[in-house]
C-alpha cells in the first residue's frame, strides 16, 4: 500500500507545483489532532484510549482530493471509502474521551484521509487541478486497520518525525 501511495504522491509532485510531500514512512490517518500537551496528560490520554474496543477491519483508499477544495488545493489527499464508518465510530470514541478530559470539541467535520502533499505555491496549479479532476475516483487499494496510536509529532527542518506514545490494538486493548 505504501508503494501505491508513494507513486500517487510522486505523480502529484511531477505537476511542478511547489509543495512539501509526505515521506513514505509518515503516511497515516489522523483521527484527532490534539496539539501540545504535557507528558502526564499524554499518559492519561493513552490510558483512556485503552478503553476503545474494535475488531480488525479493512479500509479502502480511493479518490484523490484536496482541502479546502480541488480547484483551490492546499492539502492533497487520498480519501477513505469502505471502512470509513468504522473509522468514524472510533474517532467519535476518541472525541468523547478528549472532551471528557476538558479538550474543546473538534469544530471541523471528520473526513478520513491520507495526506500526500501540502501545497506551497501557485506555479503550475492548473496542472494539479486537472490531475485532481482526472483522479477523483482512483482506486488505491485496501489495508487492514489493526491498531490506533497516540503519536507525538516532533517537527524538524527535514519534516516531522512521529513517535508512538501509546497503541491500542484491535480485539484487545493495551499500550506498547
From Swiss-Prot:
It comes from the Archaea. Disulfide bonds: none annotated. It comes from Aeropyrum pernix (strain ATCC 700893 / DSM 11879 / JCM 9820 / NBRC 100138 / K1). The lineage of its organism: Archaea, Thermoproteota, Thermoprotei, Desulfurococcales, Desulfurococcaceae. It catalyses: a 3'-end 2',3'-cyclophospho-ribonucleotide-RNA + H2O = a 3'-end 2'-phospho-ribonucleotide-RNA + H(+). Keywords: Hydrolase. A motif (HXTX 1) lies at residues 28-31. This is RNA 2',3'-cyclic phosphodiesterase. Signal peptide: none annotated. The active site is at residues 28, 113. Hydrolyzes RNA 2',3'-cyclic phosphodiester to an RNA 2'-phosphomonoester.
